[in-house]
Amino acid sequence: RSGTSAPKALQGWISPQGLMEQLEKDIATANSVLQNTPFDLLRDPDGLNLRKYQINAIEAAERAIIDGKQTVLLSMATGTGKTRTILGMIYRFIKSDRFKRVLFLVDRTALGEQAEDVFKEVKIEELMTLDSIYNIKGLDEKEIDKETKIHIATVQSLVKRILYPESATMPSVTDYDLIVVDE
C-alpha cells in the first residue's frame, strides 16, 4: 500500500488468489515503465498509425492513472478512431504490467463485434495483432480465465452474470483491474 492510496469500499470479498495478485503488483515500477515507454509503436505506419490527437488522449489517460485517478473519461467524436485509440492504450497498460486484466464493456453486441474485429486485425508490434500477443475472450465467452488479458462483454451480459450467476461465471471484485466502457 502506498502513502497515496485512498481507501475505498469493495463490492464483495477478495478471493485468496485475488489477494495474492494484489500483493504481487508493483504499481510504482509499472508506472515508471509506462512513463518511459516511447509511443513509436503507436505512430508506426505499418501498425496502429495513430494521429497526434489520439496519442495525446492516451498520454492524458496514462498521466491520470499514474497520478492516482480511479476514473478517466475520453470523449471523441464519431469516426475519430476511438477503438484504435483504446486498443493502443490497453496495449500500453498491459505491456507495462500496469493492469493485468481488462474488461472492455460495450452497450451493444455490434460494438463488441466491431471492437473484437479491430483487436484481431490491426497490427501493433512486429506485425502481430493484440489478439495474437495477448489472450482475448469475445462476447460469446462467459467464463473468466486467469490467462485472459482482455475480455469483451456487453453491459447486459455482465449484469446477468452478476445478478443471476451460473456456476463460476460471476466475476470477482479482483477479476478485472481495468474496465473500459465504449459508448
Placement of each model-derived feature along the sequence:
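Walker B catalytic acidic pair
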Residues: 182-183
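Conserved helicase motor
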Residues: 109, 130-141, 155-160
